């Protein structure tokens, strides 16, 4: 159950924060995604109300109306959504039965639980995508050690074991080295009540994502394919448009994303995470990895690199307003995550004024989080003409925000 800390202030929110007649969107979640929605809401003339676990949570620091509560508690959800024009999320972990109850009570969930279940349960997602003919690896439910053994045999040991629910940034995923390790894992996790599935490992060459926005009325808009680079299971950087993508593959990915959004009834932003690999003819091909029905880490570049950011678009979509232009504003945009390290670190806030000195176009976004190893505490966005140079400068600026020192002979003036 999520930690709830009242601290100072009214735990039941601040209704006076909203101008009469202004649409109120209830956001279930208090992380950096909700934090960045708040900026977009101000520009759109919308007002947000958060359901947050703590007054000092990332989004709660910047939102005037915060209801303190637990997203697994239906009564707390009711407090947060009372009077809201629409209800949306910055994570997929709200119990589906609670979301269904909200709809039955007359609230406007966007996306709706029938769509969101495909981002909550990986087996449900795989089964539905297979029905749609989307490219997915072989998969199977794993309910016993025998199931695990059978799948190991079927795939010649190319097994990725996953928790069906939860898990992100590399958590809830296991790559057993042998059959006995797999069956031991399954036995242990099953005893602990973890529902499991297995997939055949994909020999991928890089990771891509396509972001799609869809309104309840059915309008759809997509951004160009993005390449993401993972380090230790965590997204370290994203580059858009993804370099070296064949135009036909770009079109196929966009069509795939739009089909998934439409057929699943997704509203708001949908991120379709993709594995890229070489097919039998040697051409780059794609398979679906996972889905996220909310703004996504690989879409943060849109804050500076697109006419319409993913955060603005998400709020437009859940309100069933016309979608914005998704055209790019530069030949290349790079997002570099600011990740906490495990060594002595300087205060990242003190580093902000100097982080963009060598490249003034650097845009810093910090999340108001404490530093922990590997934790996403912010990101840097940078647009440019040259992919290699833009990647280098974005990485160095992100590194400086953690370590307060320039690496690779890059120095502030």
From Swiss-Prot:
Region (Disordered): 1-21
This protein's record includes keyword Nucleotide-binding: yes
Swiss-Prot/TrEMBL keywords: ATP-binding, Ligase, Nucleotide-binding, Purine biosynthesis
The EC number(s) this enzyme carries: 6.3.4.18
Residues the entry annotates as binding ATP: 122, 162, 199-202, 207, 289-290
The protein's annotated pathway: Purine metabolism; IMP biosynthesis via de novo pathway; 5-amino-1-(5-phospho-D-ribosyl)imidazole-4-carboxylate from 5-amino-1-(5-phospho-D-ribosyl)imidazole (N5-CAIR route): step 1/2
Annotated protein name in UniProt: N5-carboxyaminoimidazole ribonucleotide synthase
Species the sequence originates in: Corynebacterium ammoniagenes (Brevibacterium ammoniagenes)
């Amino acid at each position: 159950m999520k930690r709830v800390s009242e601290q100072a202030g009214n735990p039941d929110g601040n209704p006076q924060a909203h101008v009469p007649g202004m649409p109120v969107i209830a956001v279930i979640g208090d992380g950096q995604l909700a934090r960045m929605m708040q900026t977009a809401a101000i520009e759109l003339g919308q007002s947000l109300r958060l359901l947050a676990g703590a007054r000092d949570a990332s989004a709660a620091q910047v939102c005037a109306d915060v209801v303190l509560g637990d997203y697994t508690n239906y009564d707390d959800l009711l407090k947060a959504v009372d009077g809201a024009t629409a209800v949306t999320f910055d994570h997929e972990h709200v119990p589906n039965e609670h979301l269904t109850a909200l709809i039955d009570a007359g609230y406007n969930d966007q996306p709706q639980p029938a769509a969101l279940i495909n981002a909550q349960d990986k087996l449900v997602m795989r089964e539905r995508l297979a029905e749609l003919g989307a490219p997915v690896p072989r998969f199977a439910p794993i309910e016993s050690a025998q199931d695990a053994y059978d799948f190991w045999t079927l795939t010649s040991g190319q097994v990725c074991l996953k928790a069906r629910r939860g898990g992100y940034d590399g958590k809830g995923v296991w790559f057993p080295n042998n059959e006995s390790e797999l069956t031991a894992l399954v036995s242990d996790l099953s005893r602990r009540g973890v529902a499991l599935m297995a997939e055949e490992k994909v020999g991928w060459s890089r990771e891509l994502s396509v972001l799609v926005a869809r309104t309840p009325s059915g309008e759809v808009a997509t951004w160009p394919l993005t390449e993401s680079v993972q380090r230790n299971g965590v997204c370290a950087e994203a580059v858009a448009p993804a370099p070296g993508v064949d135009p036909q593959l770009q079109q196929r990915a966009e069509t795939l994303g739009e089909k998934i959004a439409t057929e699943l009834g997704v509203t708001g932003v949908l991120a379709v995470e993709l594995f890229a690999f070489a097919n039998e003819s040697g051409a780059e091909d794609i398979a679906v990895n996972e889905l996220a029905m909310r703004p996504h880490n690989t879409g943060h570049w849109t804050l500076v690199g697109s006419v319409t950011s993913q955060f603005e678009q998400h709020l437009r979509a859940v309100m069933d307003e016309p979608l914005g232009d998704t055209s790019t504003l530069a030949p290349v945009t790079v997002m570099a995550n600011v990740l906490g390290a495990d060594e002595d670190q300087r205060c990242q806030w003190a580093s902000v004024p100097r982080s963009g000195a060598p490249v003034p176009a650097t845009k810093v976004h910090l999340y108001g989080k404490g530093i922990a190893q590997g934790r996403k505490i912010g990101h840097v966005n940078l647009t440019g003409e040259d992919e290699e140079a833009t990647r280098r400068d974005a990485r160095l600026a992100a590194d400086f925000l953690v370590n307060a020192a320039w690496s690779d002979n890059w120095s502030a003036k």
